[in-house]
Design a protein with these regions (language model features):
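Divalent cation-coordinating acidic motifs and surrounding scaffolds
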Residues: 1-252, 283-285
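Surface-exposed interaction regions enriched in Ser/Thr/Asp/Glu
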Residues: 250-285
Length: 285
């Protein structure tokens, strides 16, 4: 189910979104038992099982038990391989698939590793995390980020994966039952949620060919359907000032990211052919 849906629903939605994406698979493609091998083949993966397909697909091969994925991610040997293909300003999305709980790593330890440990600079800050954690675990029903952690497990799971649930709730991720016999809807929901989250954030360039960027003159322009009459979203000081359409910087003095206000985000994500442009204003050379 996981292999089929990574190559099917997930890959199709991500590719159709026209996002500048990268997928990193942390799993073993070389198990002696074929049923346990995780091979992601074309169009997303490479023609040879377990190989990279730059610039969009990378596989870090390691046997993962049902309980140790967080600990192994934090292991220097494997994290360095993962980090080599991460981009500092890009939004990250984790998808955990297991019927067990994390041992010994807690959600708080994993989050601290990402924000202030070896992952610092790649996953955001405690004030604004640059990642979301989706969980396909032992919960008995699909759960939204706003719903509390459940202790009721689905039929074939060892437990409900409480640590993974904590990470999903913390970051606004989805939780789905690993016991489902068909993951199509699960990966469809997760892929769409990733596209929507990324669509509402734009990375700022370090410089402009036209000169020094004047951040007070930057405009965010939305074109309905990709060809309609453009609308310019106004700049607001911060998220709290979002009362209608608009956008704000993560750091007004030296922005690295532009985030759309909720109203504008909804407008853009509801438009399958939306075009959003960052128009730079310059001080001159």
């Amino acid at each position: 189910q996981v292999k089929a849906n990574v190559n099917g629903n997930f890959a199709n939605i991500i590719q159709a979104s026209k996002l500048d994406y990268r997928v990193i698979m942390f799993a073993n493609s070389a198990y002696s038992t074929a049923a346990r091998q995780v091979c992601v083949l074309p169009p997303l993966g490479a023609a040879t099982c377990g190989q990279n397909k730059p610039p969009t697909f990378f596989q870090v091969n390691r046997s993962i038990e049902s309980w140790d994925s967080l600990s192994l991610f934090m292991n220097t040997t494997y994290y360095n391989q993962i980090k080599a293909n991460l981009r500092p300003g890009a939004f990250k999305a984790f998808i955990e698939v297991t019927d067990d709980q994390s041992n010994p790593t807690t959600a708080a330890q994993f989050d601290a590793f990402l924000l202030s440990g070896a992952g610092a600079g790649y996953f955001g800050t405690a004030a604004k995390r640059g990642y979301v954690f989706h969980s396909i675990v032992g919960v008995n029903t699909p759960l939204l980020p706003t719903q509390p952690k459940t202790n009721t497990k689905c039929s074939s799971a060892v437990n409900t994966g409480p640590q993974y649930q904590d990470l999903s709730i913390l970051t606004g991720g989805l939780r789905h039952p690993v016991c489902d016999t068909n993951y199509s809807a699960v990966f469809n929901n997760i892929a769409n949620s990733i596209v929507k989250a990324v669509a509402c954030e734009l990375l700022t360039p370090a410089q402009s060919d036209a000169g020094v960027i004047d951040w007070t003159k930057v405009q965010v322009q939305y074109t309905p359907g990709g060809t309609g009459t453009p609308t310019t979203f106004p700049q607001v000081p911060n998220a709290a000032a979002c009362t209608g359409n608009g956008y704000y910087y993560d750091n007004p003095a030296n922005p690295t990211k532009v985030t759309l206000c909720p109203n504008s985000c909804t407008t853009v994500t509801n438009d399958a052919s939306a075009k959003v442009d960052l128009l730079l204003g310059c001080l001159g050379s």
